[in-house]
Amino acid sequence: TAVAQASILGLYDPDRLKRPLIRVEGSQRGEGKYRVATWEEALDHIAKKMLEIREKYGPEAIAFFGHGTGDYWFVDFLPAAWGSPNAAKPSVSLCTAPREVASQWVFGRPIGGHEPIDWENARYIVLIGHHIGEDTHNTQLQDFALALKNGAKVVVVDPRFSTAAAKAHRWLPIKPGTDTALLLAWIHVLIYEDLYDKEYVAKYTVGFEELKAHVKDFTPEWAEKHTEIPAQVIREVAREMAAHKPRAVLPPTRHNVWYGDDTYRVMALLYVNVLLGNYGRPGGFYIAQSPYLEKYPLPPLPLEPAAGGCSGPSGGDHEPEGFKPRADKG
């Protein structure tokens, strides 16, 4: 998603593909011989090849891969209708999977494609491994600019003096691979200096005593040995976060697959947010709301699951009478 800076290059690249291309009949893969085709011809060509493969090898011989907004139809619905259980989103395992699993464990729901951060009302933002302005979505960069305009203080944890670091009031050049140690030390300070949101934690969380016991020895002095960030700086940032709670936030980034401990690292990051009491509050994480829509008369779907492992729509697969979805399903 490095479109923030590269989009202009892609738009005007002389080699940008603007129309469908089909390999010239008789040429071999690797020769680079293609001809321009219309969209209708290209789609018909793909459909014809898919039908030929299914006829010869069966529907399972085709795998479907998708990514991003709108891929539901391509990764979920189409494979089920086609009859292939082979569908996946491989990019997720390289990007957001750790944060989605961590969020499910900590918050009880995934983060989702667009990070639900209330940038506009945040007053203290800590970016850890978050290369905003370099490899994030344009809309997120716009939100970040709005936060700066509204006077938010920014801390950037990054071995490089990044684009975001140039906008920060603190830059913490951490030793690569030690982010979890820093997060654990922040948790230690928030708890043992009695800086966390006690009412919020008591009302909305479980397991606090276990977390407190777990981080007992993860002091800033311990973290300094691993991160090469001075213990006093670690303490100061934790205290500044606490002073701005609940409008202090550590946004979970994309591209989370780093060192193998990624899910646990993101869990530690989310624990800091919980201790700041910012989940579901202005300046922190907002909870996306879905409006309730009255029942609409739709014709039954006759399509049954087409193959083992597929969960295609079914004529008998419908919500019970009177069912109302939760407003916060997001």
Regions from the PLM with identified roles:
Residues G177, A181-R247:
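P-loop NTPase catalytic nucleotide-binding module
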Residues G68, Y72-W73, T205, E209, ...:
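An alpha-helix initiation/capping motif
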Residues E55-P59, A87, Y192-Y196, P220-E224, ...:
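Intrinsically disordered or highly flexible coil/loop and linker segments, enriched in small
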Residues A80, L184, H188, R239, ...:
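Generic alpha-helical structural context detector
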Residues A61-G70, K225-I229, T253-G260, Y292-L293:
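Conserved short loop/turn motifs at secondary-structure junctions
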Residues M241-G330:
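A glycine-rich, hydrophobic/aromatic-adjacent loop/helix-cap motif
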Residues V92-C95, T205, A238-M241, I287-S290:
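Short linear loop/turn motifs
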Residues A2-L195, W222, P230:
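N-terminal export/assembly segments and adjacent metallocofactor-ligating motifs
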